């Protein structure tokens, strides 16, 4: 039992150092780096098994200390044993030791679950930030694509406008050419009439 309590005390010291470090006014970047290194260190399968076994041992010592402390307290306050001859001072010393062990184990378990939960929260925050960075990058790429499409759309609108203008000019030139041809044929017909000649179409009919 003394060996287990020594082990629990060492674990408690490590947890206190760990929590004290993260209560210091250090940058969030440094905290994340430490958390990431610890996650790599204790994220393996063997490390997880070791931590679970260690937590189980602390829980066993905690429960054993509470049970023994309760039994000794009950023994000291039992009316039948009040007048019995036994070393009450020794029993009080044992009860004090078990109560001390229960306090140390309880605080150790509390810090253990606190650190475990904070590690999970930091891991979730890191994943959220990574997702946020990826989303921001994708959004930026989408905005660049949209800007490129809008620019191409403006160019297409300009080209369509120019094509419509050219089409109108072509229609105007075509109409003008048709009018010029009609006028030319009319003048040629009048000219032929003045010369007393028949049009080619009439000659073919003859």
Curated annotation (Swiss-Prot):
InterPro entries named in the record: BAP29/BAP31, BAP29/BAP31_N, Bap31/Bap29_C
GO BP terms in the entry: endoplasmic reticulum to Golgi vesicle-mediated transport; intracellular protein transport; protein localization to endoplasmic reticulum exit site
Keyword Acetylation: no
Coiled-coil region: 140-198
Lumenal side: 1-2, 68-101
Signal peptide location: none
Transmembrane segments: 3-23, 47-67, 102-122
Lineage: Eukaryota, Amoebozoa, Evosea, Eumycetozoa, Dictyostelia
Bilayer topology: Multi-pass membrane protein
Function statement: May play a role in anterograde transport of membrane proteins from the endoplasmic reticulum to the Golgi.
Location of this chain's protein in the cell: Endoplasmic reticulum membrane
Topological domains, Cytoplasmic: 24-46, 123-206
Protein name according to UniProt: Endoplasmic reticulum transmembrane protein YET-like
Principal location class: endoplasmic reticulum
Keyword annotations from UniProtKB, A to Z: Coiled coil, Endoplasmic reticulum, ER-Golgi transport, Membrane, Protein transport, Transmembrane, Transmembrane helix, Transport
Disulfide pattern: none
Gene Ontology CC terms, in alphabetical order: endoplasmic reticulum membrane
Family: Belongs to the BCAP29/BCAP31 family.
Motif Di-lysine motif, residue range(s) on this chain: 203-206
UniProt keyword annotation of Transport present: yes
